[in-house]
Design a protein with these regions (language model features):
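Ferredoxin-like alpha/beta domains used as RNA- or RNAP-binding modules
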Residues: 1-105, 129
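A contiguous pocket-lining binding segment that forms or flanks enzyme active sites
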Residues: 111-129
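Extracellular-facing segments of soluble proteins and assemblies that are Gly/Ser/Thr-biased and enriched
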Residues: 101-104, 109, 116-117
């Protein structure tokens, strides 16, 4: 399984919001509002297509929960099969993940830290690691 191991604040700047979990004053998004890459291209950007906007929102959700594409696709397939609005079902499934629950309860500062707490075995569910 491959996961993103590059600079986390680069993704914050790329998607225009704090995704890395750092405090707002320490995140790269607050220091530099421009997206990463060539600076001369900033004034020449066109309006993104509908597909580009949908892809950007999907990637933003993926990086917010720090999951890989295959996991995200499986969550989407499960959400579509459930009755109701598939987008709401998808967000509900993502919120039910153990690392997100630990993050929401305040046991960790970031979702990455919550994943590390789980993988190191500090959290057990029904006496199972």
């Amino acid at each position: 399984m491959s996961r993103y191991t590059g600079p986390k604040c680069r993704k914050c700047r790329q998607y225009g919001m704090v995704l890395c979990g750092k405090p707002a004053n320490k995140c790269g998004w607050e220091r530099r509002k421009s997206p990463p890459g060539d600076r001369s291209v900033l004034s020449q950007r066109r309006r993104p297509s509908e597909y580009a906007m949908q892809l950007k929102e999907k990637q933003k959700a993926r990086f917010m929960y720090w999951i890989v594409e295959k996991q995200f696709r499986n969550y989407y397939k499960t959400a579509v099969k459930k009755p109701g609005i598939s987008g709401d079902n998808l967000m509900a499934l993502l919120e039910l993940r153990l690392d997100n629950v630990i993050y929401r309860l305040g046991f960790s500062d970031t979702r990455q830290q919550a994943r590390q707490i789980i993988s190191h075995g500090h959290i057990s569910v029904n006496e199972k690691k």
